[in-house]
């Protein structure tokens, strides 16, 4: 016995030593790859190594990437050591890029094999004998969707019309199987919930699901359930009768695909194949897997119950049920003990899921064209339809709005009068879910437009170019690069209005608008945004876009680097729902989770997830809740780390060879005091380039007036700086080649500046007006002033007595329209009047006068309100904003600006009239 024990210890020691040697060998190889290369390639390889370091905890023992290193995290997955098809698709993309840099594509191959083994249900998980019982003439039984979880279970309706599935037979004929080749979206990697593989309660990983009960069901209101429901766990009918009403229930399997993840996997495989050829590596067998996945992904192009698009009360007869877009899901299932099956598409389409890059690959690349008779043609149609979809949804500002549905309210209800449509499908501000609204998250903007930018890079399609030109202009106006080296990107967006009904031509959507309601530092979204900007910059030659991408990458790296990757602190206000969110369970229903947690009316999120009580971060959560505070966490999401790594690697690929030609400036930040005025000197290292000019916003400074060039020294004149509003301005040094550079200057006034004019009796308050322009383009068909009105006095001010004036040149006298997109006192309480001035002055022949209704109330001492305005000419002809007196091209957030005037009871109290 002693000898055996010693032998075992020796073997364990040997394995441990081999592991250390392999890790050291890998580090040595990576050091060799990165040692003489540019910093962006080095960053990619550093992050790749940290993601693969077992001590950092990104991967399970099965080699599956977790959603996050941390376990206490609730978003789409409700536990950190679940994973998603999204994470798996990023895994492929990461390894494709690693192969590009090192020539080693074995990690990419392993990623595909992991997907096939664990994420695509095997024949054991979706028995072919059951799937062979599917009838494409009767794909599934209709069940209406409802808004609230409390309206479930949803009763099956066997009499409702259901159309014909036109692709099933050709898929069976092409691939010789009845099973579906697509990823299920959610995996319990370590079997935390305890359902097990095929309900054995033990094995891992296990296919699970959560969302099932309508648009208002947040993750906090879900009941986790197994995909293989043999009725032995849960209640008397397993979990089935929580969701669907039927006369009797059968043991069954059911899986849901997230189409954006499968599309990303195909996109990643395309680039892996291109880069592998550079190294003489053959990836043809993995290309075939991606092609096959794309063939089945066509199910996402069809209405949920294969009803006609635009005539959704009628059953479809084939392709008349195809919207040709990437919808929110497709799903399938069948009997465990009986041979029957069903397949559904999805009626709801989100702009954030579209992928014209993947559509182009599957339609045009001979290696990727699906083997089925109609696969490539369907993807060619999808490409055209997706590009139209983006055009239809692009707001007046440039952001992409939500999406459309062929099943209004999820029940194929008649469309209300006046709703905008796309091929007969109704506009939806937030497709699929409303808690929170699905298109509030800025990340969808970055994700979806990254694919458009990549497609533009590959094809030069002018439709993509036009979409990106407008979108990137909007991005430049809303991303903040602060003078202290920090950055902010939009966090949440708010939408108003709707697009024009689609007739085949983009109208500019004058009635569809977006505003930013919060800012943050979502690192994954910032990485994806940088990726999009880089592809756009490379193709269009827009160096300002490249510089913005570079700033995001550099600032993330400098601010948020840690020993596991990158992470920013997150304040989680929603975590109060751990304790307070009741999960709806129908009266009379009772059952248990695998660990014994009771499922019954009145339970909370935590009640049916009691294993969280043993999580290492739970005491922190509990303490914050007891103190009435929102806890702050640092997370390492796998997809976000990949997005950052990939963006850095992409910078190396697209611009790495140009590093030696970059120019530099010193300093990159400075301060100008209006009370102690001095020129600012900047030293330039040209590296063979020439300075084309210096830009403030979209306008160039005047050499010899605003600045002087004296060899390697640029002098920014104090006279120019004195004319700027207090706050922060950015000056872009535009070089003939390589990177442009940005000088950030804080404008301060230690002398206090000009005193605002005191109002006359009877009102004693004093107003301070801060403002900025949401659209700083030189030429634009819309002017978008933003105002913050602050009462710095000691008495209340009736807002109905307050007026603001924004001065501008009309540039072609036409009738004009004003809109209040948002106001903290309610948009309906804001008025806008256009006044033609008796005598034109420099920068002004008109002013917009903002007023307030009596219902707006009063502005109390120390309080402020915000107004987001917008105006345009009735024929949408352009304004030249740089000529306008009140236009501020440099501010991207609220700053004091005395070229906006304010009046109380007709008396000037703030600002300088032109």
Swiss-Prot record:
The segment(s) forming the CBM3 domain are 763-914
Reaction(s) catalyzed by this protein? Hydrolysis of (1->4)-beta-D-glucosidic linkages in cellulose and cellotetraose, releasing cellobiose from the non-reducing ends of the chains
The question of whether Cell inner membrane is a record keyword is answered with no
What keywords is this UniProt entry annotated with? Carbohydrate metabolism, Cellulose degradation, Glycosidase, Hydrolase, Polysaccharide degradation, Signal
Q: Which SMART domains match?
A: CBM_3
Q: Does the keyword Hydrolase apply?
A: yes
Could you tell me which Pfam families the record lists for this protein? CBM_3, CBM_X2, Glyco_hydro_48
Alphabetized InterPro entries for the sequence: 6-hairpin_glycosidase_sf (IPR008928), 6hp_glycosidase-like_sf (IPR012341), Carbo-bd_X2 (IPR005102), CBM2/CBM3_carb-bd_dom_sf (IPR008965), CBM3 (IPR001956), CBM3_sf (IPR036966), Endo-1-4-beta-glucanase_dom2 (IPR023309), Endoglucanase_F_dom3 (IPR027390)
Q: Name one GO biological process term.
A: cellulose catabolic process
Q: Which PROSITE patterns does the record match to this protein?
A: CBM3
What GO molecular function annotations does the UniProt record carry, in alphabetical order? Answer: cellulase activity; cellulose 1,4-beta-cellobiosidase activity; cellulose binding
Q: Which N-terminal stretch is annotated as signal sequence?
A: 1-33
Gene3D superfamilies (UniProt xref): 1.50.10.10, Endo-1,4-beta-glucanase f. Domain 2, Endo-1,4-beta-glucanase f. Domain 3, Endoglucanase-like, Immunoglobulins
Q: Which family does it belong to?
A: Belongs to the glycosyl hydrolase 48 (cellulase L) family.
Q: What is this protein called?
A: Exoglucanase-2
The species this protein was found in: Thermoclostridium stercorarium (strain ATCC 35414 / DSM 8532 / NCIMB 11754)
What is the name of the gene encoding this protein?
Answer: celY
């Amino acid at each position: 016995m002693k000898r055996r024990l010693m032998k075992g210890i020796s073997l364990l020691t040997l394995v441990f030593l081999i592991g250390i040697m392999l890790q050291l060998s890998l580090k040595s190889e990576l050091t060799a790859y990165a040692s003489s290369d540019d910093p962006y390639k080095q960053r990619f390889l550093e992050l790749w190594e940290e993601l693969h370091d077992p001590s950092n905890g990104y991967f399970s023992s099965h080699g599956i990437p977790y959603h996050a290193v941390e376990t206490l995290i609730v978003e789409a997955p409700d536990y950190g050591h679940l994973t998603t098809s999204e994470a798996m698709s990023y895994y492929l993309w990461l390894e494709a890029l690693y192969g590009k840099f090192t020539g080693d594509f074995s990690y990419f191959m392993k990623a595909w094999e992991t997907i096939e083994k664990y994420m695509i249900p095997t024949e054991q998980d979706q028995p072919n004998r059951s799937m062979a019982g599917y009838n494409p003439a009767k794909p599934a039984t209709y069940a209406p969707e409802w808004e609230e979880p409390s309206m479930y279970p949803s009763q099956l309706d066997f009499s409702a019309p259901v159309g014909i599935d036109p692709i099933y037979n050709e898929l069976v004929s092409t691939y010789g199987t009845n099973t579906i080749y697509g990823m299920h979206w959610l995996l319990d990697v370590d079997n935390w919930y305890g359902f097990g593989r095929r309900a054995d309660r033990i094995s891992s990983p296990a296919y699970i699901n959560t969302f099932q009960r309508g648009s208002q069901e947040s993750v906090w209101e879900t009941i986790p359930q197994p995909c293989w429901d043999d009725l032995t766990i849960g209640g008397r009918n397993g979990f089935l009768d929580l969701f669907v009403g039927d006369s009797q229930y059968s043991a069954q399997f059911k899986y849901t695909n997230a189409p954006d993840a499968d599309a990303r996997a195909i996109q990643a495989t395309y680039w892996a194949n291109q880069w592998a050829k550079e190294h003489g590596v053959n990836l043809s067998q993995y290309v075939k897997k991606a092609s096959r996945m794309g063939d089945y992904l066509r199910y996402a192009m069809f209405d949920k119950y294969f009803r006609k698009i635009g005539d959704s009360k009628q059953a479809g007869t084939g392709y008349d049920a195809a919207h040709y877009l990437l919808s929110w899901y497709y799903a399938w299932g069948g009997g465990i003990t009986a041979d029957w099956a069903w397949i559904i598409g999805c009626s709801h389409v989100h702009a954030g899921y579209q992928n014209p890059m993947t559509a182009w690959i599957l339609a045009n690349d001979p290696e990727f064209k699906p083997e089925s008779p109609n696969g490539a043609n369907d993807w060619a149609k999808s490409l055209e339809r997706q590009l139209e979809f983006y055009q239809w949804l692009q707001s007046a500002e440039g952001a992409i709005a939500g999406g459309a549905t062929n099943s209004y309210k999820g029940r194929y209800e008649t469309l209300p009068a006046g709703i905008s449509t796309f091929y007969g499908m109704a506009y939806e501000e937030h497709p699929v879910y409303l808690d929170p609204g699905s298109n509030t998250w800025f990340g969808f903007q970055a994700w979806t437009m990254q694919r458009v930018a990549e497609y533009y890079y590959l094809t030069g399609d002018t439709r993509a170019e036009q979409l990106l030109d407008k979108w990137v202009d909007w991005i430049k106006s809303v991303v903040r690069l602060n003078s202290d080296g920090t950055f902010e990107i939009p966090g949440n967006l708010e939408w108003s209005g709707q697009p024009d009904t689609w007739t085949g031509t983009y109208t500019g959507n004058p009635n569809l608008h977006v505003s930013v309601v919060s800012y943050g530092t979502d690192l994954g979204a910032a990485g994806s945004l940088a990726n999009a900007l880089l592809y756009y910059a490379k193709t269009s030659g827009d160096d300002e876009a490249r510089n913005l991408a570079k700033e995001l990458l550099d600032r993330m790296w400098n601010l948020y680097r840690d020993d596991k990757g990158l992470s920013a602190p997150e304040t989680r206000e929603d975590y109060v729902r751990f304790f307070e969110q009741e999960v709806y369970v129908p009266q009379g229903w009772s059952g248990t989770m695998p660990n014994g947690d009771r499922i019954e009316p009145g339970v909370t999120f935590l009640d049916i997830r009691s294993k969280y009580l043993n999580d290492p971060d739970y005491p922190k959560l509990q303490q914050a809740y007891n103190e009435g505070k929102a806890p702050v966490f640092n997370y390492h999401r796998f997809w976000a780390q990949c997005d950052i790594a990939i963006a850095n690697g992409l910078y190396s690929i697209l611009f790495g060879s140009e590093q030696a030609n970059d120019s530099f400036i010193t300093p990159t930040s400075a301060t100008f005091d209006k009370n102690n005025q001095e020129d600012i000197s900047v030293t330039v290292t040209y590296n063979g380039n020439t300075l084309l000019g210096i830009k403030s916003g979209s306008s160039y400074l005047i050499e010899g007036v605003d600045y002087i060039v004296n060899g390697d020294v640029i002098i920014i004149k104090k006279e120019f700086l004195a004319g700027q509003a207090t706050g922060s301005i950015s000056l872009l040094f535009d070089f003939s080649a390589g990177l442009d550079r940005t000088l950030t200057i804080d404008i301060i006034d230690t002398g206090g500046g000009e005193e605002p004019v005191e109002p006359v009796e009877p009102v004693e308050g004093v107003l301070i007006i801060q403002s900025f322009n949401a659209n700083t383009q030189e030429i634009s068909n819309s002017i978008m002033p933003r105002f913050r009105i602050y009462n710095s006095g000691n008495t209340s001010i009736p807002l109905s007595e307050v007026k603001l004036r924004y001065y501008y040149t009309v540039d072609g006298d036409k009738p004009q329209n004003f809109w209040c997109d948002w106001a903290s006192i309610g948009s309906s309480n804001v008025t806008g009047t256009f006044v033609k001035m008796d005598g034109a002055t420099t920068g002004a022949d008109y002013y917009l006068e903002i007023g307030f209704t009596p219902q707006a109330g009063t502005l109390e001492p120390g309080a402020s309100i915000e107004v987001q305005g917008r105006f345009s000419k009735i024929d949408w002809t352009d304004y030249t904003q740089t000529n306008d007196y009140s236009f501020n091209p440099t501010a991207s957030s609220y700053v004091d600006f005395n070229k906006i005037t304010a009046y109380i009871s007709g008396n000037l109290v703030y600002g300088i009239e032109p």
